[in-house]
Amino acid sequence: MNPKDIYPDILKDIKLMQLASVRDNKPWMCNVWYVMDEDHNVYWISRETRRHSLEIKDNSHVAATMHPWFDKGLMNDPGQAMIISGQAKRLSGEECRMPYELYAERFPKLREFQSLEKFLNDEGHHYFYKITPDEIIWWDEINFPENPKQEVK
């Protein structure tokens, strides 16, 4: 069984990602609405003034996780999660076109929230950010109970 055959169906229903950034050896975690392309690059929108955005500007190393919520707790609810570490950056200009379309497909209100033209011209209140993964782990206690840590990249 290949984890790449499993997680796309699970992740399609998970819209919230936990994003970890760091500055001066002090980690920070936040939640953002995300999309992922076929190459596992991850995109989200945020203001430049948010703590995670400021930290990414100074230090591009980030980590992120996406997972279903668990109701039963330890030992009663096997876990599944995607864990990513990589480099993040703010996108500008034409770099925003493809993630805008992906994001608008998943979150249709984006078109009302901020136009593509504003992103392309770096004129909006929100900007696109991208994680290019260095490492991807699919943690799956359901399909791989003896070895839940499955390396994807």
Regions found by a protein language model. Name each.
Residues M1-M17:
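Extreme N-terminal tail/first-helix region
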Residues L11-K12, K57-D58, A104:
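Alpha-helix boundary recognition
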Residues I14-E48, I56, A63-P68, N76, ...:
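Short beta-strand segments
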Residues K15-L16, H61, P108, I136:
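Generic structural signal for secondary-structure transition and capping sites
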Residues D77-K153:
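Charged, gly/pro-rich active-site loop segments
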